[in-house]
């Protein structure tokens, strides 16, 4: 485990983007596992800036996203497909057919979970997985006490997660209560993992995740066992 302390959010974003860009430059057809939420936005902005300067080419890159709300159309402004399009995909030259986000609208959600796992396997696995961390230690939408051995599955969102996401909706009652997410097992199978955390409110959970016991009550704690984990954090 490598822990990097950033001096600011912009420094965190540059450092994270540098790791991602190095992965793409060294292996243009890399499979990137991508995350949503407020923390990765600066990282994506930095990647877009470097792309516009001609420093990085995404034309052969493949992306797989961690999760999606159940019941939201891809065109819904709160869907994670929409988030990725607006914050990254439409600003770079990654082919749309190379971008994968699980569907929250599939008629058979269990089949969608199995198909998403098969997709990742057929792509040869994830080369670099980007992660944020929730206040309760969730990664993806793997809530506390979810089994570590799960692959892609449907989850009922915890109260703290719903409250945290309510700021993106006009009313807390509009926040979806279920999501499809890559499981802990799926995440741990990535060749490299990059965890980013920003803000003083993330300090306690990062300490629990990285230095506390490995337990399903803190989902991110399993990352202690990953053979190639980099953590970039800024608690300012």
Swiss-Prot record:
Catalytic activity, as annotated: alpha-D-glucosamine 6-phosphate + H2O = beta-D-fructose 6-phosphate + NH4(+)
Keywords associated with the record: Carbohydrate metabolism, Hydrolase
Enzyme class: hydrolase
Pfam family, one: Glucosamine_iso
Catalytic site positions: 67 (proton acceptor), 136 (for ring-opening step), 138 (proton acceptor), 143 (for ring-opening step)
GO molecular function: glucosamine-6-phosphate deaminase activity; identical protein binding
GO cellular component: cytoplasm
Pathways per UniProt: Amino-sugar metabolism; N-acetylneuraminate degradation; D-fructose 6-phosphate from N-acetylneuraminate: step 5/5
InterPro entries: Glc/Gal-6P_isomerase, Glucosamine6P_isomerase, Glucosamine6P_isomerase_CS, NagB/RpiA_transferase-like
Presence of the UniProt keyword Thylakoid in the record: no
SUPFAM superfamilies in alphabetical order: NagB/RpiA/CoA transferase-like
GO biological process: carbohydrate metabolic process; glucosamine catabolic process; N-acetylglucosamine catabolic process; N-acetylneuraminate catabolic process
Enzyme Commission identifier(s): 3.5.99.6
Highest rank taxon of the organism: Bacteria
Keyword Hydrolase: yes
Entry similarity comment: Belongs to the glucosamine/galactosamine-6-phosphate isomerase family. NagB subfamily.
Reported function: Catalyzes the reversible isomerization-deamination of glucosamine 6-phosphate (GlcN6P) to form fructose 6-phosphate (Fru6P) and ammonium ion.
Protein name: Glucosamine-6-phosphate deaminase
Taxonomic placement: Bacteria, Bacillati, Bacillota, Clostridia, Lachnospirales
